[in-house]
Each structure stands twice: as structure tokens, then as C-alpha cells.
Amino acid sequence: MRRILLSMIVLIFLASPILAKNIVYVAQIKGQITSYTYDQFDRYITIAEQDNAEAIIIELDTPGGRADAMMNIVQRIQQSKIPVIIYVYPPGASAASAGTYIALGSHLIAMAPGTSIGACRPILGYSQNGSIIEAPPKITNYFIAYIKSLAQESGRNATIAEEFITKDLSLTPEEALKYGVIEVVARDINELLKKSNGMKTKIPVNGRYVTLNFTNVEVRYLAPSFKDKLISYITDPNVAYLLLTLGIWALIIGFLTPGWHVPETVGAIMIILAIIGFGYFGYNSAGILLIIVAMLFFIAEALTPTFGLFTVAGLITFIIGGILLFGGGEEYLVRKEVFSQLRILIITVGAILAAFFAFGMAAVIRAHKKKARTGKEEMIGLIGTVVEELNPEGMIKVRGELWKARSKFNGKIEKGEKVRVVDMDGLTLIVVRERKEGGEK
């Protein structure tokens, strides 16, 4: 009996390595490559390292992003103690520009059918006339040397890697596999694990070669947090620009309709989110400054109508500010289409604002013509709201228009109180506090 028990114990110990599962982590990176993307890579790789995983697979879909963030990510991948597999997924995804460098810096590259890789020419953003600023030869040559070294280190086709920059070359999965740029074409994670099982890859941090063992594997997914999703969304330059624009207009609406507070609150939140997005993606502070100046022009037009002078100045400043927003000299590794789409958005928003103010100015002109015909008789008796304390002079809003006003009895009338127009002195309304019983103390 004792021999039987001992035999069973020995069999259990011998079987335990066979029963043990190889852990593979899967994480998703989607959107612009920013400094926050590096934080995601670092967090995901660290989790996999701590669990002594067989590998970590990063599902990548990106149009590119900042060069400095990309290089930090590549460095983190090459310092990893376990294999990092870049999987361009799902179908329709791309590892463009900065994404290509990240893929070439990984230990194994896989692509799903219908994806693409390549087009890595560095650009510097937008010029004042709206054209894309190409990187000077010195910077371009640096990135050519960098991408070739990444390809050579991993035994991939350095000539094609160079053409990703010099010819803005893009490849399908089948072409990339044929030219020795990637190792696997797979429809899903299961097919990727099956095809890459037994492949050898070099771990630069210790110089050793590792044979991937994806038999008896346990796949663990690292779901993106709410913060990951939010940052990924607002670092899209189109989204960040819209948030900034809508936020500014919400502040203007709140400024012109005091006492409600909702537009100011929503606008402030939008602007904060836009600033966070710009902070991760990179921006030109001159562009932000011009957009703020444009906002001041619009507010000035609303408070002291100049029949279009401040509006035109605001629109021109607003569009130039938007164009310069991404022309701060940072090296961007993104598809040119990203900046082209942004330019279209800036022009479209500018056109909408122009149309809005054209109709707005027409309404103001009609209102002023009407006032000129009717005189003060039409104003007397109207009820308004104090928007700037009368002590004895201030501002009130009557029929949705801002007017300079003066208390008839030189008393103080608080902001938010109702007043009645009793006379006019030039363009200044003479008012009294509106009370149920009438009169003013």
C-alpha cells in the first residue's frame, strides 16, 4: 500500500509541469501614440513580467503620433524580460508611422488580414499657410538610421524599412510577410498562438534567444480602464480641437447669459479635457494664445457691437490659431491624412462660425435700424435684468440685448434684480427697480 501511495505522489509531481499552463497576456493599444501610450505599454509589460508570462501580445491600431513617445516605447519593449508581440489588429487597423517603429522594435510582429504597416516620413506639423511642414533632411536621415537599426537588430528587411520613410511605403500583411518585415499573418489570437508556437526570438535585454511555447496556454486579457479610453479619445487632435472650440463658445454663451452657470461649467470641463489632450499629443502655445485672442474678439463684438469688425478679426485669428496649434516643432510620426483631416475640420468650423456671425450681425443691424425708427418710446416700460451692478451705472439685458443703464435715483441695484426702463439719456437707459408695488428706495 505504501508503495502504491509513493508511486502516485511521484506521478503527481512528474505530471505537474505538464499540467502547468503557459500564461500569455493580451492588451489593446488604440489611437494616437503619446506619452500616455508609453505609460500603458509600461504598465502592461510590467504586469506580464511579474507573472513570468510566456509573452504579451499588444493589439495595435494607430495612425502614429509623437516621435519621443514612440522611442520611449521601443526602449521599454527592448528592456522587457519577456517577448513582446505586436499584433496589428483588428481587420482595418494599421500600424502607421510611429506604429511601424514600435512594431519593428518588438520581438515578433503579426498582422491580421486587411491591415497595413508603413508610411513613416517624419513631419513637423502645420505652417501658417496651412501646408504640412516636412522634417528637414537632418531629422529624416536620423529616423532612417533608427528604423534600419531596429530592423537589423531583429533580422528583418532593413531595405524595406528604409523605404517606409524614403518612399512613404505601406504594405499589406501578405506583402510584409513576403518581404520579411513581419513573421505571422493571423486572423485572431488563437491562430497567432498556433502559428508562432515554436518560433525563436531574441530578447535584447539579455541577448538570449527564446523559443515561444504556446502549448497548453492560458490567455489573460488586460482590459483598458476608463482613463485609458478617455485619454485615447481626447488625444485625437480632431477631438481635442473640437473640445477646445466648443468649450470656448460655451464660456462665451455663459458670459452673455449670466446667472445660469451651466454653459460656463460645461465649457470649462471641455477646455480642461482639450488641454489634457493637447498636453499628451503636443501643441504650439502660440496657437492656443491666438484662439484665446479670438475668443476675446468675439466677446468684444457681443458687448460693443462694431457691425462685424471684431467678428472678422476673431474669425481670422481663430483659423490661424487652429492651423498653428500643431506646428510647434515636435517631430510627429503620423499619416499625413491626420493633419489633412484636421485642416478640413478647422476650415469647416471657421465657415460655420462665419455663417453664424453673418446671420447674427444681420439680426443686430436690423434691430438697430428698428431702434432708430422707433426711438426711446419703444424702450420705455420694458423690463430688464441687471447683469452688472448699477452703482449708479452698470449693464442690463433687455430683450436679449445688453444696454448701459443708470439708476434713476442713483441707488445701488444688485446683479440679477429686475428693473423697468423709465427714460433714455442718449444710449443709456434710465431704470428703476421693478417691484410689485412699484418705486425704488
From Swiss-Prot:
Inhibited by divalent metal cations, including Mg(2+), Mn(2+), Ca(2+) and Zn(2+). Mildly inhibited by 0.01 % SDS and 0.1% dodecyl-beta-D-maltoside. Activity is nearly abolished by 1 % SDS. Optimum temperature is above 90 degrees Celsius. Residues 1-20 form the signal peptide. Keywords: Hydrolase, Membrane, Protease, Serine protease, Signal, Transmembrane, Transmembrane helix. Its EC number is 3.4.21.-. It is found in: Membrane. Changing residue 97 to A: Abolishes enzyme activity. Pfam families: NfeD (PF01957), NfeD1b_N (PF25145), NfeD_membrane (PF24961). InterPro entries: ClpP/crotonase-like_dom_sf (IPR029045), Membrane_assoc_protease (IPR052165), NA-bd_OB-fold (IPR012340), NfeD-like_C (IPR002810), NfeD1b_N (IPR056738), NfeD_membrane (IPR056739), PH1510-N (IPR033853). GO terms for molecular function: serine-type peptidase activity. Optimum pH is 5-6. Belongs to the peptidase S14 family. Homodimer. Protease that cleaves its substrates preferentially near hydrophobic or aromatic amino acid residues. Can degrade casein and the stomatin homolog PH1511 (in vitro). This is Membrane-bound protease PH1510. It comes from Pyrococcus horikoshii (strain ATCC 700860 / DSM 12428 / JCM 9974 / NBRC 100139 / OT-3).
